[in-house]
Amino acid sequence: MSAIRSALKEQRPNLSDSSLRTYSSVLSNAYKAVYPKDESIDIKNFSNDGAFMKHIATMPHPSTLLAGLVVLTKNAEYQKAMNKKIVEHKSDEQNQMKNDKQKESMIPKEDVQLALNKLKVQADHIYKTKDTSAKAMNILTNYILLCLASGIYMEPRRSLDWTEMKIKNKDDALNFYDSKTGTFIFNKYKTAKVYNQQTEKVPIELKKILDKWVKYNPNDFMLFNTKGGKLTSPNIATRLNEIFGKKVSTSALRHIYISDKFKNMPSLKELQETASAMSHSIPQMLEYIKK
């Protein structure tokens, strides 16, 4: 058992194996980024919130790392940053009031899982029979699309992040999946001008799925259409609508993921009303919350 995993287990004995794997992975990657010259990991260094907060500031999606740092160190600065992220998510939820069409696209997370399970059964059969027909490749592409966009295996990203994802003949102007290192390299995405190139370690379960697809996929792009061209954002929207039998976009899947992840949190309106009644700010109030 790694030093990080052991330390996490000591701090939180009831932490699930899945959470242990996820936290161990993101913490290990963050440590290497903050202390690139260290040959081994010194658990005490994770308490250096100044160094790690600088690294976190460069990340577009630091929630999982922050959660891991809170469990591992119980550091107050990490807890404050995590609380701030929760408030931001709730603010997004409040500001993006769903109109009737958006409400229709909001489905339970369980329905997303069911759709993924159905496609997995079809994909397993195709791999087993070595079917390379256009219909089979179309089904496999849908399966991979949902694996990437559903939020089941990783935090869901925007359509652009996947339409520009190559798996062969790397292009530095586009995104790339490196199967050797199990890493996503994002060069082309909505906030690239702010965050520049972003790399993200692929969760083990997803890596197994993608590596199998890379060997089977004859195309340079991760996702492609029946004519061999890369999928576009409208193509992805159409495919998701077909998969779910209703209008469910990548934006809706991102919203479903956030709503499910923070489903036990009170609404931002409730937080604001309570904070106002107690004459302090929401971040101040959240500092009193111990989880």
Predicted regions and their residues:
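C-terminal catalytic core of tyrosine-transesterase DNA break-rejoin enzymes
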Residues: 252, 256-281
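Flexible interdomain linker/hinge and immediately adjacent N-terminus
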Residues: 80-128
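Non-catalytic DNA-binding core/recognition domains of DNA-processing enzymes
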Residues: 5, 9-90, 255, 278-279
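Basic, Lys/Arg- and aromatic-enriched nucleic-acid-binding interface segment
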Residues: 116-159
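Conserved tyrosine-mediated DNA breakage-rejoining catalytic core shared by Y-recombinases
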Residues: 160-204
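Short, charged amphipathic recognition helices of the HTH superfamily
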Residues: 62-67, 156-164, 265-276
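Active-site/catalytic core of tyrosine-dependent DNA strand-transfer enzymes
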Residues: 201-257, 262
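A short, basic/aromatic helix-end/turn motif that makes direct DNA contacts
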Residues: 164-170, 271-282, 286-291
